[in-house]
């Protein structure tokens, strides 16, 4: 998650040792990316995040240097459709739409899974809960669909609330925003 600080229940900074928070483990660093972006290692032998989190590729995409995922720069290209339409919109995204000039074709983009979308969240921020200085445009402090269906339901899927980073689930007929991604899985 890129978190290196730990917090108590009132939001105050605390020592990370023994908390079990992300700041203690500093997990989520891709070892392939680590040599070019990261500095020292922690007690768990994972690199501590010290690099530039996002790269604006200048073609309508943004690379997350922490996860190596490529995101659509425009986080509000489609407005808020239902879940089935959100899946379709992401899958049919291609060069020439939504500000893209990257040469991508339909089928290369997809709706992110719940872990991928939540990896963008910075819990020290709100409205939206994204890292300060992020390069994205059109971000709504609202609900965004993920591709992850709820395991014990045939009509519910997971979302991330960009206002504060909360993850929840809702009926697939609800209309939430779409933020396509490519790479990873």
Task: Give residue spans per PLM region.
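Glycine-aromatic-enriched surface loops/turns that form tight recognition elements
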Residues: 1-110, 114-185
